[in-house]
Curated annotation (Swiss-Prot):
The keyword Iron does not apply. It comes from the Bacteria. This is Uncharacterized HTH-type transcriptional regulator YusT. Belongs to the LysR transcriptional regulatory family.
Length: 295
């Protein structure tokens, strides 16, 4: 069993089809198929269940994937450790939520790249649970997540604090009407969605109409058009409020701050590129929250 075969297996498991995996790897499909078949023959077990929609992991495949993630992660860490130098260089894969990418990251990344041009930065966005899983599978060097992290395999560092605010169209006159609207949110696993649903339950709305969106721009556009309400950082939407296109409602004090933390695996090697990146941000607090609360 070679590491290259495990990487092919890992990609097929992730993409769900030979075609997509081959495209991601830059291989021909027949090569990917042959390597999966060779791996199954070597291990004497079926790793994938084939069906019309693609391929899903068998019980043996799920077990192997856990080991493959660890082995590949350790090999990549060894490569980083051996090639690391005092001068930051090489790939640096960072993850963050879309709200963090919109407000906090542009200046931070631009400043970092200006100082360390030999680092190949890449940025992956997604909701908090997606990013946690990516870091745990060694697919990201680190990630900004929208909550406190207590996972036993992860180390977390405070990065930013945001003030979440309920956002509605400017035409919505008050919070009593706002809570009757659908909520526009990311998929399950988003900390802002969880906080919004928690607040709605506290004011008696237990089953809101939920509309899931894939991008921050789509959520803001839907809110502006009067489709529904959402919960977003004040720093993201204050420009829209100043333009008069939306209305903001502060949350009660107990929910008025959300922490953004930067997470890495505890067993990961911290390269010079990652260390200097982590040194480039410090805990930042937003302006003091308004004392008024909803309802």
């Amino acid at each position: 069993m070679e590491s290259g075969d495990l990487r092919v297996f890992q990609m097929v498991a992730r993409e769900g089809t030979i075609t997509k995996a081959a495209l991601q790897l830059g291989y021909v499909q027949s090569n990917v198929t042959a390597r999966i078949q060779q791996l199954e023959a070597e291990l004497g077990t079926t790793l994938f269940l084939r069906h019309n929609r693609g391929m899903t992991l068998s019980a043996s495949g799920k077990l192997l994937l856990d080991y493959a993630n660890k082995i590949i992660g350790l090999l990549d860490e060894a490569s980083k450790a051996l090639s690391s130098s005092a001068e930051p260089s090489g790939p640096l894969m960072i993850g963050c939520t879309q709200t963090t990418a919109a407000v906090r990251l542009p200046k931070l990344l631009a400043s970092y790249y200006e100082e360390h041009p030999n680092v190949q930065l890449s940025l992956t966005t997604g909701h908090t649970q997606f990013l946690l899983d990516k870091v745990l599978r060694y697919e990201l060097d680190g990630a900004f997540i929208g909550c406190e992290c207590h996972h036993p395999e992860l180390e977390s560092y405070p990065a930013f604090e945001e003030e979440p605010v309920v956002v509605s169209a400017a035409s919505v006159p008050d919070v009593e009407e706002a809570i009757t609207k659908p909520i526009l949110v990311y998929s399950t696993g988003c900390s802002y969605r969880e906080t919004l649903e928690k607040w709605l339950r506290s004011v008696g709305v237990t089953q809101p109409v939920i509309m899931e969106f894939g991008t921050l721009e789509a959520i803001i556009g839907g809110v502006t058009a009067g489709l529904g309400i959402s919960l977003l950082p004040r720093t993201v939407v204050q420009k829209h409020e100043a333009e008069g296109s939306i209305r903001l409602y502060p949350l009660p004090e107990a929910l008025s701050q959300m922490k953004t933390e930067f997470i890495v695996r505890k067993d990961s090697f911290i390269s010079s590129a990652l260390r200097t990146f982590m040194d480039s941000f410090t805990p930042v607090k937003t302006a003091e929250s308004q004392k008024s609360s909803l309802l």
